[in-house]
């Protein structure tokens, strides 16, 4: 456990990334290839910026990232725009009616020592993020989101499957073994009429 944490923590520092979470996105991208070089991406819960940093440095050659978070972000890049605020107060007009090719989120709620409470808070946050994603994702866009595993996961996956051609559960090697975090990769968004 600790060795894995130390390895990814050190690797992030060596590669000048803001957080070890970057390797979770890197693993998912290597597996699913869901972000293309020209994509416009919305990064929800983007602070401290490692997802955005990775996408702009390694994948997006002409694309851009808009990051949103309730916490300030110190990451800067010419193709990165940061919006400070709560996603529950946002809609497509927040982004000047721009639609995104991909929405990613490594956001997590405030946690407690109770795993079940953490799961329910995570599902609630994910549903709020998904509500925003439904407004801002392009047809056939992709959605990648962190969630804490638990008893409401299957219901949430079922909700997602109504809007996407496929929903895959992904547990990165860079996640801590004891962590209940998993990611859902949702491919090819379809707007329900």
Curated annotation (Swiss-Prot):
Could you tell me the EC number(s) of this protein? 2.1.1.166
Entry-linked Gene3D superfamilies: Vaccinia Virus protein VP39 (3.40.50.150)
- Residues annotated for S-adenosyl-L-methionine binding in this entry: 49, 51, 69, 86, 106
Q: Name one Pfam family in it.
A: FtsJ
Entry keyword set = Cytoplasm, Methyltransferase, rRNA processing, S-adenosyl-L-methionine, Transferase
Compartments annotated for it: namely: Cytoplasm
Spell out the HAMAP family in the cross-references.
RNA_methyltr_E
**Hey, which family's this protein in?**
Belongs to the class I-like SAM-binding methyltransferase superfamily. RNA methyltransferase RlmE family.
Recorded protein name is Ribosomal RNA large subunit methyltransferase E
- Gene name of the encoded protein: rlmE
């Amino acid at each position: 456990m600790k060795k894995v944490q130390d390895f990814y923590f050190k690797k992030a520092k060596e590669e000048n990334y803001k957080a070890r979470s970057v390797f979770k996105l890197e693993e998912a991208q290597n597996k699913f290839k869901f972000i293309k070089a020209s994509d416009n991406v919305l990064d929800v819960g983007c602070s401290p910026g490692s997802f955005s940093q990775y996408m702009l440095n390694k994948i997006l050659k002409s694309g851009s990232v808009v990051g949103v978070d309730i916490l300030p972000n110190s990451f800067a890049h010419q193709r990165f725009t940061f919006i400070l605020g709560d996603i529950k107060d946002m809609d497509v007009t927040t982004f000047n009616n721009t639609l995104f090719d991909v929405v990613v989120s490594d956001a997590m709620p405030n946690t407690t020592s109770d795993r079940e409470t953490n799961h329910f808070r995570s599902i609630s946050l994910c549903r709020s993020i998904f509500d925003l994603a439904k407004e801002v994702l392009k047809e056939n866009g992709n959605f990648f989101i962190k969630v804490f595993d638990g008893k409401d996961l299957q219901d949430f996956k079922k909700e997602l499957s109504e809007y996407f051609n496929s929903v895959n559960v992904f547990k990165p090697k860079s996640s801590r073994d004891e962590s209940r975090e998993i990611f859902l990769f949702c491919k090819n968004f379809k707007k329900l009429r």
